[in-house]
């Protein structure tokens, strides 16, 4: 018997219906939310991501604000564009699409984003608020994972969660979310320096794989009935694959597919952050 699918697409569609209603109410009160994006260069993947985000905006009535910049812009021009969106009253929240060209300092750019307009939840101030459990926009992927688990009735309180990956977009913020009193999980954060990874994953009630190593997590590393969330994406020849080997589906109780699991929720929680900023809930 195979695992139950944690369907991110169906869950996303439920959230989009709710967001459309909330955006309509905001628009009626004269506060239409606006999502801005700053995109530098001509990377096909980045352009595809940005197009998808603005297509999502159109579905729910959020205003799209695009700032597409050439690959050879100066640091000063990038910073001026950030300041322009900081001051733009039509822009409720925005993102700087990563990665930036190597000659541009990503951390310096992100620090210039107004924390009150940080749609990604990755500004240092907002990450600090996450540590303190004070209100702030939450990192979209980590928030999406938590919502997906709740949507399928996965018990979190008192469980042992093993997160593979310590990145700032997934691993670290997810660990902070799961150890809040409202979740009360016990978290082990693993990474490239972890010895005997399988010994830890076999103890886990929930495993989140977010390192971008193709099929890193195999069936012999998973306790029967465990919940497995596949976040990492890698390109192998002509196709995209996740961190979780297909044989895990025969052992685990629940598995999120990849693609189609967490990815759709990352995008929809970007919109959710913007709507909540417009509502004054952050």
Swiss-Prot record:
- Give start-end ranges for the coiled-coil region(s): none
Note the InterPro entries from the entry.
Aminoacid_DH-like_N_sf (IPR046346), NAD(P)-bd_dom_sf (IPR036291), THF_DH/CycHdrlase (IPR000672), THF_DH/CycHdrlase_cat_dom (IPR020630), THF_DH/CycHdrlase_NAD-bd_dom (IPR020631)
Cite the binding residues for NADP(+). 165-167, 192, 233
Q: Which CDD domains did the record assign?
A: NAD_bind_m-THF_DH_Cyclohyd
Q: Name one GO cellular component term.
A: cytosol
Q: What is its EC number?
A: 1.5.1.5, 3.5.4.9
Its biological purpose is as follows:
Catalyzes the oxidation of 5,10-methylenetetrahydrofolate to 5,10-methenyltetrahydrofolate and then the hydrolysis of 5,10-methenyltetrahydrofolate to 10-formyltetrahydrofolate.
Q: Which keywords, in A-to-Z order, does the entry hold?
A: Amino-acid biosynthesis, Histidine biosynthesis, Hydrolase, Methionine biosynthesis, Multifunctional enzyme, NADP, One-carbon metabolism, Oxidoreductase, Purine biosynthesis
Q: Which Gene3D superfamilies match?
A: Leucine Dehydrogenase, chain A, domain 1, NAD(P)-binding Rossmann-like Domain
What this protein catalyses is:
(6R)-5,10-methylene-5,6,7,8-tetrahydrofolate + NADP(+) = (6R)-5,10-methenyltetrahydrofolate + NADPH; (6R)-5,10-methenyltetrahydrofolate + H2O = (6R)-10-formyltetrahydrofolate + H(+)
Q: Which HAMAP family match?
A: THF_DHG_CYH (MF_01576)
The yes or no answer to whether the keyword Coiled coil is present is: no
GO MF annotation terms: methenyltetrahydrofolate cyclohydrolase activity; methylenetetrahydrofolate dehydrogenase (NADP+) activity
Kindly state the subunit structure of this protein. Answer: Homodimer.
Its Gene Ontology biological processes?
Answer: L-histidine biosynthetic process; methionine biosynthetic process; purine nucleotide biosynthetic process; tetrahydrofolate interconversion
Report the protein name in the record. Answer: Bifunctional protein FolD
Entry similarity comment:
Belongs to the tetrahydrofolate dehydrogenase/cyclohydrolase family.
**Is NADP one of the keywords UniProt gives this record?**
yes
One matching Pfam family is THF_DHG_CYH
What pathway does the UniProt record associate with this protein? One-carbon metabolism; tetrahydrofolate interconversion
């Amino acid at each position: 018997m195979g695992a139950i699918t944690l369907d991110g697409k169906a869950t996303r569609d439920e959230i989009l219906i709710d967001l459309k209603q909330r955006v309509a109410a905001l628009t009626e009160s004269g506060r239409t939310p606006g999502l801005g994006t700053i995109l530098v260069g001509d990377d096909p993947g980045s352009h595809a991501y940005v197009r998808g985000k603005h297509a999502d905006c159109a579905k729910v009535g959020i205003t799209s604000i695009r700032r597409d910049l050439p690959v050879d812009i100066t640091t000063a021009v990038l910073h001026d564009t950030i300041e322009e969106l900081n001051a733009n009253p039509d822009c409720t929240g925005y993102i700087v699409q990563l990665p930036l060209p190597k000659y541009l300092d990503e951390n310096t750019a992100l620090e210039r984003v107004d924390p009150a307009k940080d749609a990604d939840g990755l500004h240092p101030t907002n990450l600090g608020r996450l540590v303190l459990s004070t209100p702030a926009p939450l990192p979209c992927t980590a928030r999406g994972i938590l919502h997906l688990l709740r949507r399928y009735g996965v018990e979190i309180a008192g469980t042992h969660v093993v997160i593979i990956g310590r990145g700032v977009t997934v691993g670290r913020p997810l660990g902070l979310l799961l150890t809040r009193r409202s979740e009360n999980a016990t978290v082990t954060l693993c990474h490239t320096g972890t010895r005997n990874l399988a010994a830890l994953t076999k103890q886990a009630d929930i495993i989140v794989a977010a390192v971008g190593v193709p099929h890193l997590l195999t069936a012999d590393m998973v306790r029967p009935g465990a919940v497995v969330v596949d976040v990492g994406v890698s390109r192998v020849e002509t196709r995209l694959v996740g961190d979780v080997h297909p044989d895990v589906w025969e052992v685990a109780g629940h598995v999120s597919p990849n693609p189609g699991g967490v990815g759709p929720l990352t995008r929809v929680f970007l919109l959710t952050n913007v709507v909540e900023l417009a509502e004054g809930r952050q």
